[in-house]
Amino acid sequence: YNEIALRKGVKLMKDIKMPVVIPAVDIKSSKKFEFNNLKNESMYISDSSVGKAVRAICSFPGVFCPCVYKEYSFLDGGILDNIPVNEVKKFGADKVLAINFKADDIDESSNFMDISMRTLDIMGNKISEESLQNSDFVLTVETDKTGLLDVNKIDSCYNFGYDAAIKNMGKIKTIFKV
């Protein structure tokens, strides 16, 4: 997970130039932690590698093992806070761009896994409602039937996000005055 970050000269979370908050949940304590580049307090982790933070948020319950970091065992932070807008604002961000992935529709050809994943999407969307309302701009990314577990489609997902950002660049520049 560090390979891409290292290509950009970034090794640790604290090396990232713009504010970043990546939520994770310690399965042992049920507490939320944030991998970030802004604070170094007990619930905030800025001394980890970017790869470790990414691995933690990829630890989807029931699918991937928890990510062990120091004395913690992290799962995907979306369990408690899927889009940490309020956390980013606590760190002083004036404006927040939230990224939301559009869930695919269920139809008569949907199987058990499709329905299970859609159920998780519904729960995640409910958890995210307040955060999305508190953000200054929501970039919605359509994933063309790419599911959470379709790890072989990572390049496609990157392209979906890139295309959505380019399509909305005018609005983004206006809101964020870039």
Can you say where each PLM-predicted feature lies in the sequence?
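Patatin-like phospholipase
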Residues: 1-178
